[in-house]
Amino acid sequence: ALSSAASDVYKRQKVENVKFEISDYKKVAKSIIITKDGEESSIDLTENDLVFITNGGCVENSSMGSQNTPAVMNTEIKAGGGWDLWRKIAEQDSSFGNPDKFCYDPELTNWMSATVTTLDDRIPPYVQKICKRDPFSGKVVTGGIVTVKDSNWLLSWTFNRQPQFRSQPKGQLVGWIYGLFSNVPGNYVKKPMRDCTGKEICMEWLYHLGVPENQIEELAENSANTIPVMMPYIDAFFMPRNGTDRPKVVPNQAVNFAFLGQFAETERDTIFTTEYSIRTAMVAVYTLLNVDRGVPEVWGSTYDIRDLLNATVKLRDGKPITAVSYTHLT
């Protein structure tokens, strides 16, 4: 889409820095410092150029394991990444935020996820027993996440409408597992989640599904393929902050640049959603280009009992909230 709109896309290049000229009455992005194949160069900018900066990055340093290998926890912030870029930008003006409020301790911001693919018909009945829906129906399955409240890892899992992918083989399910406490031993697998292979994470999940213990390892080995991912900074945007630790989308006196994404400050909205990032981009474009168009307001549903009740009924497949049933696993 960008190429068809006469855009030039530069691949295999790192943006190392954006340099600014700061005065009392305006702030101007003057150059972009890039490296390619180890060689540094710069792109000079004028006030008529526009620079949109995604500062920080929740998925930076993410690593992928496999069915038989753990995902490595890599916490080193390197040049050319979103955190290092933001640090260099923030050094130039206080209005550009404080990235170290968010990325200073990956032990506080990490968690792990895994994609599990069931390969036959042996695991799906355990999923159906909990969610009360046929996961092969082509309709909503879990309707959200299922959290195992007594899990040492605080494990959660979900299966969305299947098939998840067009090329997904018939008879297979693709689901998502994640754990918020990656540094403590599991209830069944007696090792931290971050040290576990995909198979071992699947074993822990199967244990919480209620699979008989004498079947767990064999099912995890032969009836599923599980790929773990470690994300050291995935919760960075939830770290405590004040009103200036994130830069405004368009800082005061900014002439030709804006910040985008989860680490740019907007009014009323809450991070963690795709909508948040999209709204920052709309604010940036409309402001810098003087577009006379309103950004969609944040819907004030937080304390609206009508929205809360409507969402509850939807999650219950239209059943009234008075018709409560409980599932007990023994």
Residue ranges and their predicted role:
Residues N48-N55, E60-Y303:
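C-terminal segments that line or cap access tunnels to active or ligand-binding sites in enzymes
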Residues T35-E39:
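FAD-binding core/adjacent interface of flavoenzyme oxidoreductases
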Residues A1-A6, Y10, H328-T330:
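Single conserved hydrophobic/aromatic residue that forms the stacking wall/gate
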Residues L289-Y326:
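Active-site-proximal substrate-binding core of FAD-dependent oxidoreductases
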Residues K11-V28:
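A conserved short coil-to-beta-strand element within the FAD-binding core of flavoproteins
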Residues K30-I34:
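Short polybasic amphipathic segments
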Residues Q13, K27, T46-E47, N252:
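Structured loop/turn residues at beta-strand edges in well-structured enzyme cores
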Residues E40-D49:
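Core beta-strand elements of the Rossmann-like FAD/NAD(P) dinucleotide-binding domain
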